[in-house]
Amino acid sequence: MAVHTNRQILTRGKNYATKQSKKFGTDEVTFDKDSRLDYLTGFHKRKLQRQKKAQEFIKEQERLRKIEERQKIRQERKEVMEEQLKTFKESLNLEAEIEDAKNDKTEDLQVESDESWHGFDSDKDDGDNDNNESSVKPILKKGAITEIYDDSTTVELETLEPNDNFEYLAQLNNVKLEKAEKVLKQSINRATKYAKFLGVDEKQKKKPRVKKFRYLTKNERRINQRKANDNKRRR
């Protein structure tokens, strides 16, 4: 039995492959004239179809963008409503504090009403209090100068002088210095809460301006293409 070389073995495999390809190959290639004519003459039609698809894609993107904007607006309105509800609750607390302050004032008035006249003994006590008040330096220093004119008229001149005795002044004006700091803090808190309720301290949020979509003109496309070609040449 003859021994086959490597070349003969490889050549035999090649012949077998070509034989198999011929067995399952195509016998004849036929073209559809109508389809061929449609392909060769339909460049403009396919271009219009691509443009139509691009416009539909842009419309769909615009629709999705509007939906997203409406969702953002709903979310902002929801946040505003929650903030207004919060301020409304704070205003209710403010009204409660005002009622408490009114109750405190009524209690002070009741205490003052208790200091009414209870007979001649109370007049004596009032006389003692007047003597104590006379020992305190008053806010007005009186210096009376009387001059007699021909028509018998008298003139009294009084000089104003500041008084540093705040306790005496507060007592005259029915003000309690012990509660002054507390009342001041309550007034500041009420003012800030009322300002928040009116929206004075909130800055108006400016909405970002949405850039509208537009097609480029023929000259703009030409300039952009020219710039792109120049960049390619530089590279």
UniProtKB/Swiss-Prot annotation:
Q: Which GO terms describe its biological process?
A: generation of mature 5'-end of LSU-rRNA from tricistronic rRNA transcript (SSU-rRNA, 5.8S rRNA, LSU-rRNA); rRNA processing
Instruction: List the keywords (alphabetical).
Output: Coiled coil, Nucleus, Phosphoprotein, Ribosome biogenesis, rRNA processing
Q: Which GO terms describe its molecular function?
A: 5'-3' RNA exonuclease activity; preribosome binding; rRNA binding
Explain the purpose of this protein. Essential protein involved in ribosomal RNA processing.
According to the UniProt entry, which residue ranges have a biased composition of type Basic and acidic residues?
99-108, 217-235
Query: According to its UniProt record, what is one Pfam family this protein matches?
Result: Nop25
Q: Name one GO cellular component term.
A: nucleolus
- Which InterPro entries does UniProt cross-reference here? Nucleolar_protein_12
Superkingdom of origin organism: Eukaryota
**Family, per entry:** Belongs to the RRP17 family.
> Region annotation Disordered: residue ranges?
99-138, 209-235
Name listed for the protein in its UniProt record: Ribosomal RNA-processing protein 17
- The transmembrane residues are none
The Phosphoserine modification is found at 113, 116, 122
Record's subcellular location: Nucleus, Nucleolus
- Stretches assigned to coiled coil: 49-110
Q: What else is known?
A: Present with 2950 molecules/cell in log phase SD medium.
